[in-house]
Amino acid sequence: MKLDISVKYLLKSLIPILIILTVFYLGWKDNQENARMFYAFIGCIISAITFPFSMRIIQKMVIRFTGKEFWQKDFFTNPVGGSLTAIFELFCFVISVPVVAIYLIFILCKALSGK
């Protein structure tokens, strides 16, 4: 599975990243003595870096199994149901580090096996 990430896609994925980073930064700024909040903020930064790749990997995998027609239904494209898109983006943000790590291991194993 090849990732084709364009500049437009990266810029589009910056919007949710900036929102989540801002929320975490404001929480950390108010309570800088809390070590857990500092580590959560560092984890948030790492997830922000891997988020666009994670979202693309998940989209490619889901489209492979369900087909493109499934994602073009009114349930997913209706602007009123935009909360579903927000939930999907938050899900991708939370699991971005493990997804990218698994993808990199998969690519490395594939390259080492010579296929």
Curated annotation (Swiss-Prot):
Keywords noted in UniProt: Bacteriocin immunity, Cell membrane, Membrane, Plasmid, Transmembrane, Transmembrane helix
Disulfide partners: none
One example of a Gene Ontology biological process annotation: bacteriocin immunity
GO molecular function terms listed in the Swiss-Prot or TrEMBL record: toxic substance binding
Statement: the UniProt record of this protein carries the keyword Protease: no
Transmembrane segments: 7-27, 38-58, 87-107
Keyword Membrane (UniProt): yes
Record membrane topology: Multi-pass membrane protein
A Pfam match: Microcin
Subcellular location: Cell membrane
Entry's Gene Ontology cellular component terms: plasma membrane
Entry superkingdom: Bacteria
Function noted in UniProt: This protein is able to protect a cell, which harbors the plasmid IncI1 ColIb-P9 encoding colicin Ib, against colicin Ib.
Protein name as catalogued: Colicin-Ib immunity protein
